[in-house]
Amino acid sequence: MNVKEKEELYRINQKSETSDLVRFHLCGTTFPDKAYTIKRPSSAVWCIEYVEEGKGTIHIDGDTFFPKAGDSYFLHVGKDHHYYSDKADPWKKHFINVSGKLVDSLAEGYGVSGTAHFVGLDLGGEIKEIIEIARRGDMDNTQELISILNKIFFKMHKSIKKEEEISGLGAEMKDFLNTQITSKFHMELLCKHISRSESQTIRLFKKIFGITPYTYVLNKKISFAKKLLIDTSLSVKEIATKLCFSDEYYFSNIFKEKAGCSPSQYRRSHEEKD
């Protein structure tokens, strides 16, 4: 073990004949340090890290990410790595640095070579297992290390697939709701459309877009109402009916809440501009 200020570092004992296949260069734990920074131009290693506490910033080949507690990140071999702790909330993280043909193949085979930041992915358990093997100083450990490394890549792969699924569902939900602007909102129709329960649907939509499906539809209705007020001569009552509000008074109250003025005031203000 090599203990630097604010870091606990281990080198892993490996048999030399396995080093071309996979080489574990370094592993350990970085403790909170607001001055912590690493620069690694054209990195010769892949870096896999899990943030246990705090947060920080990563720059990798022109892209910037902001990992926080509970996130993992995967910095690619051959790229410029620059990362550092947040000064107000410096991170505690666990890491491994690896290289070799096997790692290259795993990254490509699992489809993770294009992703650096894994939000909410906990690789802490696997990385700590590798740190413990290094701490013990075992020599005949390559197969165990490879098994753990494979678990890490599989979890990263699953995380990407989950994000792709969520992103696809998000677009599907939005597309469906966009057809409901002039209809009465029925949550059960959206749930049926994506084959999810109401609680699952609301939770998923809010995770992706930060608002509930109902709020999304309401915002869209008000945006369309603004267009109708400017571009048509429809009365407020007719617009309320067209957008399936229960009555013009409820519509006017919602409009004022969202737009900061009544529908009539909104129309007059745009007539004056013309």
Q: Where are the regions that the model predicts?
A:
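A short, glycine-centered helix-capping/turn motif at helix boundaries
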Residues: 184, 196, 232-234
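An amphipathic alpha-helical interaction segment
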Residues: 96-105, 109, 119-182, 192, ...
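Short, conserved glycine- and acidic-residue-centered signature motifs
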Residues: 44, 166, 218
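Terminal helix-turn-helix DNA-binding modules in bacterial transcription factors
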Residues: 175, 179, 188, 206-253, ...
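Short hydrophobic/aromatic patches on the structural cores and recognition surfaces of FHA
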Residues: 54, 70-71, 201, 225, ...
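N-terminal regulatory/effector-sensing and dimerization cores
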Residues: 2, 19-113
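Sigma70-family region 2
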Residues: 85, 159-160, 206
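A short, N-terminal "cap"/entry segment at the start of jelly-roll beta-barrel domains
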Residues: 1-23, 39, 116, 133-136
